Amino acid sequence: MPEPRPVALALTDTPTIAEERSVRGALREADAAAGFPHDTRPLAVLLHDEAGKVAGGLWGRTGWSWLTIESLAVPPALRRAGLGTRILAMAEEEARARGCIGARLETCSPEARRFCETAGYVVSGTIEDCPPGQTRFTLTKRLGMVPAEPWPEAAGPRATITRSEGEWDPLVGVLEDGLTGFNMPFGGHHGFRAVNFAVRRPGDAKPVGGLSGHVLYRWFFVKLLYLPEDLRRGGLGAALLRRAEVEALAGGCIGIWLDTFSFQARPFYEKQGYRVFGTIDDFPPGHSRHYLMKRLDGARA
């Protein structure tokens, strides 16, 4: 095997779109080479108020036969009228039409957890103290061929629901603002901050790999980590993780967490001291998605 060429690491919280695409593209190429090409499609359910303004809804994506729900928000004035249930049902119905076998989401709200469990979701994993003093739940639901829930009579004409697939949508900002306000009394300000480590070969401006993540509620999430074949098994991946851990500690983080597929890097992460706290089977079908974490504050994981 040829010796890995020297590389450089660069930390930034203001990555360019091109740099983000380079890291994401490299990971997609690796997954495609392993027989798992990305088939991601956005999925959104928009909730409009009487003035036609987007007031909430659901934002997510489908891929590898699963629906991932990133945000779900209904304004307080429209809650308890069955809209949340209807929004979930619409998203699940579309996911089934796309061939999805399951849905997943995350929440640190006990109220949201109860709502999801009422809708048929079960807890697949938890992280304590994320945000501090709270528990972060990963919930999943198997999607059978179940018809969507009927429109709730109590909702009346107060709101309408529409679906969209746009990559960028005003719905996202509405959901983020709504959830941030809802979470504030429980977890305080989220303190979101993007952090990226780009790996470049000497003399090359274009990144060939790296690590992309963010800080949220004093936890560092490793969203993407990829290195080309000739730069693996030389300690660079472990060095990237250590840089992320040092960055997390310097920022006052409690821990670091990530997810990986069974055909990717679970043994590597476990060797670095991470432990599995949750698993979703058949994601993608025939394989598993593992969630791993590592405490950085000295507390037992």
Segments (PLM) and residue ranges:
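Conserved GNAT acetyl-CoA-binding A-motif
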Residues: 95-108, 248-261
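Conserved acetyl-CoA-binding loop-helix of GNAT-fold acetyltransferases
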Residues: 80-93, 118, 233-246, 271
